[in-house]
Amino acid sequence: MSEYTKTALVLGAGGFIGSHMVKRLLSEGYWVRGVDLKYPEFSLSEANEFVQGDLTDYSIAEKSVDCNGKSFDEIYQFAADMGGAGYIFTGDHDADVMNNSASINLNILRAVKNLNEKTETNKTKIFYSSSACIYPEYAQMNPNNPGLKESDAYPAEPDSEYGWEKLFSERLFFSYYRNYGISVRVARYHNIFGPEGTWTGGKEKAPAAICRKVAELSREGGSVEVWGDGLQTRSFLFIDECIEATRRLMESDFMGPVNVGSEEIVTINQLVDIAAKVENKKVEKNHIDGPLGVRGRNSNNDLIREKLGWDYSMPLEGGIFKTYNWIKEQMNG
């Protein structure tokens, strides 16, 4: 490892954001260990070492954070039980989502604390990927949402158990900072999307699901199903921009929590139109019943601009173009 600048542990390295972070860290000269239940679905992991294991098992967490008897310089905690609206908002997976994700975070922090005590060091900086789902439902009833500020999180009332667990874990990470001096960074991700994200099977998020539905239509177009009236609004951030913002946060002295998102708000109907535009398909929308989530959610980026000098730069159309074409490649085998 002597030829590497730093060491990093990426938890959830088989997932969408984690696999992209592995690539970024390697490009910066890090030695990287990845850990996940599964290998990346769409490409080989580029991690120097990849451990397949279940982080809800404390013994796996304990082994994962140990870098040849020493602490990692940085840990990126993306591992969670999660999915899109069709997985999160039905209520059918609430117990698993809360139990599995909380167990992972409890195990990782306990393992880092114990390793610090054993080695008498405390150098590890840990990033935790929280979510815009922590924000209260009452602040997201307006589809013309002006943008959620970090201070809007309380009084707490997330609209899903996934959001409650994320909010609990934010507090968990900061409590380990206060009580044990573990350096933490927390970002609240707003709908990250892009190539190599899940695009079928029920856990995909809106951009991937809509790109797939439109790509499945003939060149002449057709009809796609949209949950609800399609007037619910969201903002979506392209994966490369998410990775850049996360790295800036880790390189800074600012702990967060901080929004990482786009301020370009669109309705789901408009998202369909953007996907249809890629191949100039004429697409009708068939509105059906389905899990919707909140009525309107958008990111307010004032804090991250102030603290990190970061802002999103890719228009939604550009990210959808790249994602649509990648999904079409997957469909064509």
Predicted regions mapped to residue ranges:
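N-terminal Rossmann NAD(P)H-binding glycine-rich loop of SDR-like oxidoreductase domains
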Residues: A8-E28
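C-terminal substrate-binding subdomain of Rossmann-fold SDR/epimerase-dehydratase oxidoreductases
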Residues: R24, N107, E216-G333
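Conserved glycine-rich Rossmann-like NAD(P)H-binding loop of the short-chain dehydrogenase/reductase
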Residues: Y30-Y39
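Rossmann-fold cofactor-recognition segment
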Residues: E46-D57
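NAD(P)H-binding glycine-rich loop region in Rossmannoid oxidoreductase-like domains
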Residues: L55-S101
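Conserved Rossmann-fold NAD(P)-dependent oxidoreductase catalytic core, especially the SDR/UDP-sugar
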Residues: L106-D159
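NAD(P)-dependent short-chain dehydrogenase/reductase
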Residues: Y138-G147, R171-M250, E263-I265, V272-E279
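Active-site helix of classical SDR
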Residues: E161, E165
